[in-house]
């Protein structure tokens, strides 16, 4: 992640994009720690947002992510109708391996139905399962597992080889099973700490956040993924909307105090939309230079983190979205939508043009 101090409020000339897939994540709702990331799911809003992603953000691909297969199907249909390549990405939370296999089979059948109707579909069988599934890294839920992995626990780290051995066996079994239902390309959205055997997959996919801890070696880490001889894709990259968020990368959201009612920020932070813009431009340049096939900004909207005027109450500071979600009413840029574009919206659109 990165040290972003430049505020890009003025337009910069964007380089010609060399990425094959110019993408963004689109959340249909998932349930980490039992919390829903998206309560409301209106198919008409979904259709409109995916058309905006195609027409105004100039994306060529979208990763449709979430925990409810029926929602994934609705959004994927609208994405395909908008002309986007669909990365059908079920994101289950707290399921055991016994529960995950039939869940992924159901999703594979849904993805195949869309594919045989002419859409370009990639199936992504899960995301960072070591944290979000039950039974790999110890912990009663995703929050506890994230805390365990983030702590200096030598005993836990000593067991990770065995953990990833079991996880790779499960992924291999799942890949073989879903290929009976799905005839397109297959991958898995991995965390950078996960030691994945990519043999069963067609694409190497990594949630490629840069932060202060890996900034010095970020390019080298990225290059390591090409050793498998398969296309490399950044299934997630992004940062939050406050000064210093780039240094926290994929953990920037942890400034929220979820024990407060209602939730609010846990300290004093300075809202900074330029932080996202700098991070976006720097990582896209790296992806182009290193030959990454496709990249998906995380995310279009953080529906559960609305913008509020008070600095401690502005949950959008902890959001990765390129739009700020409004608690009430509609925006002015898109009067039919309940959000306003952020600076990163316009920066992404400019970068993906051409």
Q: What is each of the regions a protein language model found here?
A:
Residues 14-74:
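Active-site-adjacent substrate/metal-binding segments within catalytic domains
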Residues 20-26, 60-64, 86-89, 121-125, ...:
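Hydrophobic faces of well-ordered beta-strands that scaffold small-molecule active sites
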Residues 25, 297-354:
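Aromatic-rich peripheral "rim/lid" segments of glycoside hydrolase catalytic domains that contact
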Residues 35-53, 100-111, 190-194, 277-284:
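Short, acidic/polar
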Residues 49-105, 163-184:
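Aromatic-lined substrate-binding rim segments of carbohydrate-active enzymes
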Residues 109-164, 188-193, 296:
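Active-site groove signature of glycoside hydrolases
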Residues 139-162, 247-270, 318-327:
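A solvent-exposed, charged loop/short amphipathic helix patch at secondary-structure junctions
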Residues 165, 180, 184-186, 191-265, ...:
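Glycoside hydrolase catalytic-domain groove-lining segments
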């Amino acid at each position: 992640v990165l040290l972003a101090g430049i505020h890009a409020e003025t337009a910069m000339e964007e380089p010609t994009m060399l990425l094959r897939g110019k993408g963004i994540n689109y959340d249909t709702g998932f349930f980490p720690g039992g919390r829903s990331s998206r309560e409301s799911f209106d198919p008409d809003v979904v259709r409109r947002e995916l058309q905006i992603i195609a027409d105004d953000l100039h994306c060529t691909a979208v990763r449709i992510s979430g925990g409810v297969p029926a929602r994934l199907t609705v959004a994927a249909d609208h994405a395909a109708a908008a002309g986007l390549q669909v990365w059908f990405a079920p994101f289950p939370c707290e399921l055991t391996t016994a529960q995950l296999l039939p869940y992924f089979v159901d999703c594979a059948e849904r993805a195949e139905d869309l594919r045989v109707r002419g859409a370009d579909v990639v199936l992504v069988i899960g995301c960072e399962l070591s944290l979000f599934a039950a039974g790999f890294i110890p912990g009663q839920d995703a929050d506890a597992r994230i805390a365990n992995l983030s702590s200096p626990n030598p005993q836990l780290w000593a067991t990770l080889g065995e953990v990833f051995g079991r996880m790779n066996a499960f992924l291999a079994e799942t890949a073989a099973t879903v290929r009976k239902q799905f005839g397109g390309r297959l991958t898995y959205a991995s965390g950078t700490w996960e030691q994945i055997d990519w043999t069963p997959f067609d694409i190497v996919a990594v949630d490629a956040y840069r932060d202060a801890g890996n900034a010095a070696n970020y390019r080298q880490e990225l290059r390591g993924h090409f050793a498998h001889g398969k296309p490399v894709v950044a299934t997630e990259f992004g940062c939050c909307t406050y000064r210093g968020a780039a240094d926290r990368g994929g953990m920037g959201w942890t400034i929220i105090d979820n024990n407060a009612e209602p939730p609010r920020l846990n300290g004093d932070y300075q809202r900074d939309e330029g932080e996202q813009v700098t991070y976006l431009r720097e990582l896209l340049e790296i992806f182009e230079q290193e030959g990454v096939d496709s990249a998906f900004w995380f995310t279009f909207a953080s529906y559960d983190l609305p913008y509020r005027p008070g600095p401690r109450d502005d949950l959008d500071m902890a959001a990765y979205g390129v739009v700020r979600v409004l608690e009430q009413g509609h925006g002015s840029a898109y009067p039919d939508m309940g959000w306003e574009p952020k600076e990163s919206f316009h920066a992404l659109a400019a970068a993906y043009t051409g």
